[in-house]
């Protein structure tokens, strides 16, 4: 396994925008090259860690709060974390940024109409009919990132193009003497170290981790 600083790629967007699809593709590329990585997904988490929560704003915030705790533990122990969650509220996403190591916000963008067309489970149809309350994009708001670190448009880009955009933009956003994205809002400085936490181990910049698969 390659030793590297932990980081969190946080995929946010409407249901059906392509968050999980992109995260899985990126995970496969990273894992095949020996990167220590874990993927956290909204559907999976709600079947286990947060199965007691609903979809009110309070419960949504609690959902992300628990996920943030897991991502925080993983990233500070040099694990790359791919997190795919609608996470509709800007303030909540900003909180995640402040709590985790080397946070990169990825806005997976697609028009609502496109997401509805992709909805094979018919969730949007049920939400429009009023059968599902608090459904993001229909009866509950989605606060799109005003200045995401990375912005992919899945209605215009192929899956491979989206993945390569993330790799390229992430690599451009890091340098070899810093451990957080240069173009994003920095995490609290005391949470990060510019060298490996283990004495004697070489420091490998996140730009290297992502650039080796470009």
From Swiss-Prot:
Query: Could you identify this protein by its name?
Result: Probable adenylyl-sulfate kinase
Pfam hit, one: APS_kinase
Cited HAMAP family: Adenylyl_sulf_kinase
What's the catalysed reaction? adenosine 5'-phosphosulfate + ATP = 3'-phosphoadenylyl sulfate + ADP + H(+)
Q: What are the record keywords, sorted?
A: ATP-binding, Kinase, Nucleotide-binding, Phosphoprotein, Transferase
A cellular-component GO term for this protein: cytoplasm
Check the record and name the CDD domains matching this protein: APSK
Q: Which residues form the active site?
A: 87
The answer, when asked if Ion transport is one of the entry's keywords, is no
Example GO BP: hydrogen sulfide biosynthetic process
Q: What is its EC number?
A: 2.7.1.25
Q: Which family does it belong to?
A: Belongs to the APS kinase family.
Where is the segment annotated Disordered? 174-199
Q: Name one GO molecular function term.
A: adenylylsulfate kinase activity
Residues annotated as binding ATP? 13-20
Pathway assigned to this chain's UniProt record = Sulfur metabolism; hydrogen sulfide biosynthesis; sulfite from sulfate: step 2/3
Membrane among the record's keywords?
Answer: no
User: What InterPro entries does this protein map onto?
Assistant: APS_kinase, P-loop_NTPase, Sulf_AdTrans/APS_kinase
- UniProt enzyme class: transferase
Role: Catalyzes the synthesis of activated sulfate.
């Amino acid at each position: 396994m390659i030793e590297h600083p932990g980081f969190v790629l946080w995929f946010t967007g409407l249901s059906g925008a392509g968050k999980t699809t992109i995260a899985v593709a990126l995970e496969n590329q990273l894992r095949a090259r020996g990167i220590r990585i874990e993927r956290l997904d909204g559907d999976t988490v709600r079947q286990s860690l947060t199965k007691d929560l609903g979809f009110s704003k309070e419960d949504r915030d609690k959902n992300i709060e628990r996920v943030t705790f897991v991502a925080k533990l993983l990233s500070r122990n040099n694990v790359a974390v791919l997190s795919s969650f609608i996470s509709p509220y800007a303030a909540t996403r900003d909180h995640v940024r402040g709590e985790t190591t080397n946070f990169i916000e990825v806005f997976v963008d697609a028009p609502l109409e496109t997401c509805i067309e992709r909805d094979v489970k018919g969730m949007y149809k049920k939400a429009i009919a009023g059968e599902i309350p608090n459904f993001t994009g229909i009866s509950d708001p989605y606060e799109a990132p005003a200045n995401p670190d990375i912005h992919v448009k899945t209605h215009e880009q192929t899956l491979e193009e989206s993945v390569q955009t993330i790799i390229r933009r992430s690599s451009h956003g890091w340098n070899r003497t810093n451990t957080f994205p240069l173009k994003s809002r920095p995490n609290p400085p005391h949470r990060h170290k510019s060298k490996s936490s283990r004495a004697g181990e070489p420091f490998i910049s996140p730009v290297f981790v992502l650039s080796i698969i470009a």
